Amino acid sequence: MPNVVVVGAQWGDEGKGKIVDLLTEHADVVVRFQGGNNAGHTLVVNGEKTVLHLIPAGILHPGKSCVIGNGVVFDPEVFVMEVDRLKSRNALADDSQLVVSLDAHVIMPWHKAIDIAREQAMGAGKIGTTGRGIGPTYEDKVARRGLRIRDLLDAARLERKVKERLPAAREELSRLGATPELDEAAIVARYSELGRRVARYAADVSLWLHRALQNGKQLLFEGAQGTMLDVDHGTYPFVTSSNTVAGNAVVGCGLGPTAVDYVLGISKAYSTRVGGGPYPSELKDETGERLRKIGGEFGATTGRPRRTGWLDALALRYAARVNGLHGIAMTKLDVLAGFETVKIAVGYRVDGKVLDEMPSDPELLERAEAVYEELPGWTEKLEDLRSWDDLPPRARAYVKRVEQLVGVPVVGLSVGADRGQTILLENPFRA
């Protein structure tokens, strides 16, 4: 029985939540393995919108288990809020449906304060952090001074660890010119309370998943952000603080590499990016504004307008390589309807030379100018179409050209926001 990893193949916001939601029908367990509540999944089911930032998108399916792995940085405030919201809508009737790793690191109040203060101090050099404490939490994890969920469940241990960490956090904030309220007793009291709320969901996730596999369960690993934001393989330093690529799926939940059978990359039919960093195919004209307006390109987490551009085949081919993609699900194909022509970036012009592969040096990428291939557009609306043969010939030609340029088959197409507005050409769980 195959286990499937879903990753963003661009700069995040590709529509992973919708595809994971769709594929959850064929899985028994959905696993989040990295990132935190800086990601936002917007799901529309029967016209009803749900936005989740931390809990896996599969939670909307009754009877499915959802797991938050050790690689996730965990904000218990957000978790409790999402649990309460789901329960108010009868979407989490059984607490055993949700499992959280005891070893996931916890986002503490000082992490958020440091994140915001650092970004403000950078001025024009801002990287576009969401200010939710993700980076500082990963930093503490690597420096071996972080707090984990298991620490919230022991009041004495929590008090000791807060007492150890808080002075250095206050000192850094003071250097940054920030003076947030960080009361030790209040933090210990609040996070003890949050620990009591989280305790019923906390478990040894590695062992839990191992037993699930032994019992023949199918796993769906849900990535956050996108390949181009990976801390090692993205446009460093304009990246997130975790590994977003498929190789991290098993590391972030305590399994071995043989647990993965299929890797599905999610890509929009065009491209978007939030925050700073190189983006060769960016459109800063009325075409870019048109894509933003039609596509509703505003962050689910921050509400910030996204930068928009044509599809970048070099970046997508790079994502296929570093993730080992078996297939691509292309989202928002419907947004391109009505454009007289559609373009694909097929090269970069840098210092008078044309490159046909994405350079590993982000400073070269910063100077790159996209070289485009132009294809005829289509006027037909796609939202009500449900099969490949129903698509306009020019839309099919566009998809086929992307396949040729990237070297990976397109196995799914999204033609609208609702779960039902999807054309699945190949089911990864049956590939």
UniProtKB/Swiss-Prot annotation:
It catalyses: IMP + L-aspartate + GTP = N(6)-(1,2-dicarboxyethyl)-AMP + GDP + phosphate + 2 H(+). It is an enzyme of class 6 (ligase). The active site is at 13 (proton acceptor), 41 (proton donor). IMP binds at residues 13-16, 38-41, 130, 144, 225, 240, 304. Its EC number is 6.3.4.4. One of its GO terms (molecular function) is adenylosuccinate synthase activity. One of its GO terms (biological process) is IMP metabolic process. Pathway: Purine metabolism; AMP biosynthesis via de novo pathway; AMP from IMP: step 1/2. Binds 1 Mg(2+) ion per subunit. It is found in: Cytoplasm. GTP binds at residues 12-18, 40-42, 306, 332-334, 414-416. GO terms for cellular component: cytoplasm. Its cofactor is Mg(2+). Substrate binds at residues 300-306. The keyword Calcium does not apply. Keywords: Cytoplasm, GTP-binding, Ligase, Magnesium, Metal-binding, Nucleotide-binding, Purine biosynthesis. Pfam families: Adenylsucc_synt (PF00709). Mg(2+) binds at residues 13, 40. Belongs to the adenylosuccinate synthetase family. PANTHER family: ADENYLOSUCCINATE SYNTHETASE. Plays an important role in the de novo pathway of purine nucleotide biosynthesis. Catalyzes the first committed step in the biosynthesis of AMP from IMP. Homodimer. This is Adenylosuccinate synthetase. It comes from Anaeromyxobacter sp. (strain Fw109-5). The gene is purA.
